[in-house]
């Protein structure tokens, strides 16, 4: 049976095995998908051994996306620009192909929500690894992006890297333009740490829809809770993005595109 896995550290909390095995059942694919704890010191050796033993592909989560990218032989454009991958596939010639399905997963979930139209103004909070993975697909979807982060130099470098692909502007968190935003995306890790993104409430009130790339089981993320406390109710967490990026990884491996919405709805119901 073809073997796949998700690698991360920590990994016990990962929903990827549940999601991927549901996608496999839906599409009648015979495969096994498991969670693997990566060793912070020996991850590269572990991953190469995993493929040498016959595995067909894997997902990569924190903190290994950049390290896994370095091990690949070939790359998609979106992985190359992000300098990180969340998906590896073993090709027929034995080479490793790296892709990053985070951004296309986000775009697919925004389409599910009917929140994606050309020429929207989008504010993204945060310029870390999560942001790097989503910028190219958003720009390809003709979004006008304002990228805000506490460390302006990091934001500026990232915006300059992606400027050839669309309209993107770098600002510091305390100089976000006072304009209306069709969509505000939280790409900071505030949703995981229990904090909230350090953005002025008056800025948030200029938004129409609010998407947190984090999710929390059975409760609101801090960012979603903050939005609701301001009376902003057009909100979504990132669980749909998680299922959608998994579906795009699955498609890369198996050549079949699952119906991610039905799997999302099943799992979301179970999480409440």
From Swiss-Prot:
Enzyme's top EC category: oxidoreductase
Keywords: Amino-acid biosynthesis, Aromatic amino acid biosynthesis, NADP, Oxidoreductase
UniProt KW Oxidoreductase keyword: yes
Any one annotated GO CC term: cytosol
Pfam family, one: SDH_C
Binding, NADP(+): 126-130, 149-154, 189, 213, 238
Reaction it catalyzes: shikimate + NADP(+) = 3-dehydroshikimate + NADPH + H(+)
GO molecular function: NADP binding; shikimate 3-dehydrogenase (NADP+) activity
Membrane-spanning segments: none
Pathway recorded for this protein: Metabolic intermediate biosynthesis; chorismate biosynthesis; chorismate from D-erythrose 4-phosphate and phosphoenolpyruvate: step 4/7
Active site: 65 (proton acceptor)
Entry EC no(s): 1.1.1.25
Residue sites binding shikimate per the record: 14-16, 61, 86, 102, 215
Biological process per Gene Ontology, one example term: aromatic amino acid family biosynthetic process
Keyword field contains DNA repair: no
Family (UniProt): Belongs to the shikimate dehydrogenase family.
Role this protein plays: Involved in the biosynthesis of the chorismate, which leads to the biosynthesis of aromatic amino acids. Catalyzes the reversible NADPH linked reduction of 3-dehydroshikimate (DHSA) to yield shikimate (SA).
Subunit structure: Homodimer.
NCBIfam families (UniProt xref): aroE (TIGR00507), PRK00258.1-2 (NF001310)
Record PANTHER family: BIFUNCTIONAL 3-DEHYDROQUINATE DEHYDRATASE_SHIKIMATE DEHYDROGENASE, CHLOROPLASTIC (PTHR21089:SF1), SHIKIMATE DEHYDROGENASE (PTHR21089)
Name by which UniProt lists this protein: Shikimate dehydrogenase (NADP(+))
Chain's gene name: aroE
């Amino acid at each position: 049976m073809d073997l796949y896995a998700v690698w991360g550290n920590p990994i016990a909390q990962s929903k990827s095995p549940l999601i991927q095995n549901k996608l496999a059942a839906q599409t009648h694919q015979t495969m096994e998908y498991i969670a693997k704890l990566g060793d912070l010191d020996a991850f590269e050796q572990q991953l190469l051994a995993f493929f040498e033993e016959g595995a067909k592909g894997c997902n990569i989560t924190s903190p290994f996306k950049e390290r896994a990218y370095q091990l690949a032989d070939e790359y998609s454009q979106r992985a190359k620009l992000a300098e990180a991958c969340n998906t590896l596939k073993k090709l027929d010639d034995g080479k490793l192909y790296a892709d990053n399905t985070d951004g296309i997963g986000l775009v697919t979930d925004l389409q599910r929500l009917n929140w994606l139209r050309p020429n929207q103004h989008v504010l993204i909070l945060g310029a870390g690894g999560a942001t790097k993975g989503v910028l190219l697909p958003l720009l390809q979807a003709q979004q006008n992006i304002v990228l805000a982060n506490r460390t302006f130099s990091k934001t500026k470098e990232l915006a300059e890297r992606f400027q050839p692909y669309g309209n993107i502007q770098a600002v510091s968190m305390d100089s976000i333009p006072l304009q209306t935003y069709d969509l505000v995306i939280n790409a900071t890790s505030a949703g995981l740490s229990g904090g909230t993104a350090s953005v002025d409430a008056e800025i948030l009130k200029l938004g129409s829809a609010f998407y947190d790339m984090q999710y929390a089981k059975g409760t609101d993320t801090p960012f979603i809770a903050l939005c609701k406390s301001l009376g902003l109710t057009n909100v979504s967490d990132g669980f749909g993005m998680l299922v959608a990026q998994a579906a795009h990884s699955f498609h890369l491996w198996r050549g079949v595109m699952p119906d991610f919405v039905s799997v999302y709805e099943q799992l979301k119901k179970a999480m409440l």
